[in-house]
Every structure is written in C-alpha cells, then in structure tokens.
C-alpha cells in the first residue's frame, strides 16, 4: 500500500516548517539515516522522532480548537 502526502499542505501548516529544505526539525541526522537493529527489530529513529513532532503539533492544534 502506498500513501502520498502533499508536503506543502501537511508540513506547511507548522510554523517551524521551512518548506522541506532540510533546515527544519524534520532534518535527518547522520545517526538516523538508516534503520538500526534494537532487540531483534529494525527501528527507524527518524520516523519515530518526526512522528512525535507531528503528534505534538497536532496536540497543540487540538488544544487551540478546544
């Protein structure tokens, strides 16, 4: 299954977004370039970090709406 995300629509809603020019919090750090094996499972640290960032921003939006 493939999911396409319009980065301009999704990422652009966040104040810290720099338009995917790799200058934002989304930037891949060297130690996150490849998934690593932890406890017998592959872990994608960049995906975990950016998912947490997105969850945090969505939480802020929900708090403003409430």
UniProtKB/Swiss-Prot annotation:
GO terms for biological process: symbiont-mediated evasion of host restriction-modification system; symbiont-mediated suppression of host innate immune response. Keywords: Host-virus interaction, Inhibition of host innate immune response by virus, Restriction-modification system evasion by virus, Viral immunoevasion. Signal peptide: none annotated. It comes from the Viruses. It holds the Pfam family Ral. Belongs to the lambda phage ral family. Ral interferes with the cleavage of DNA by E.coli EcoK restriction-modification system, by modifying the activity of the host methylase. This modulation allows incoming, unmodified phages to escape the host's restriction system. This is Restriction inhibitor protein ral. It comes from Escherichia phage lambda (Bacteriophage lambda). The gene is ral.
